Amino acid sequence: MEEVYLERFPEEGNSVHLLDIPSNEKDWYNPEHVNHWDKIRNVRRVVTGAIEVLRQDKVIGSSLEACPIIYIKDKELFDIIKSVDMSEVCITSSINVEFSLSSIPDSCFTLDDVPDVGVICKTAQGKKCQRCWTLNLPIDKSEGDDLCDRCKQAVI
């Protein structure tokens, strides 16, 4: 850490460990953004709860082996959830988000404090990518082709 700091700022000459921690700008705080991510985290709690049921039943070992289907009854919340990659947020191989005009299916996992959200969790299908470990490769991929399209782009 010290060497990196002195290489980046050679004119400083002081130890990085003696510097004051800079304060955040007051205008950086955005309550709307905080509210937006609070809603995403609440939906994520429902998804991880549904995944945990499969894990306890020994159906899956890792969240990457799950393919949740999220049912959302609130249009505003649905739009917020569709604006982010929920498979990345929930650490799953894939995820489906459905807007439900009627009630949420009875077989869904729900949490009392997160209304209008239900999750059905299934096991992900496919072959495991050797780089990111997601199960999204077609099962009939030829031998030696062990990277998903996203990882192929990253290593090129």
Annotated model-derived regions:
Residues 129-132, 148-151:
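Short cysteine-rich clusters marking metal-coordination/redox-active sites
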Residues 1-50, 54-74, 78-81, 96-99, ...:
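Acidic, turn-prone loop/beta-hairpin segments
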Residues 124-127, 143:
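Flanking scaffold residues of small Cys/His-coordinated metal-binding clusters
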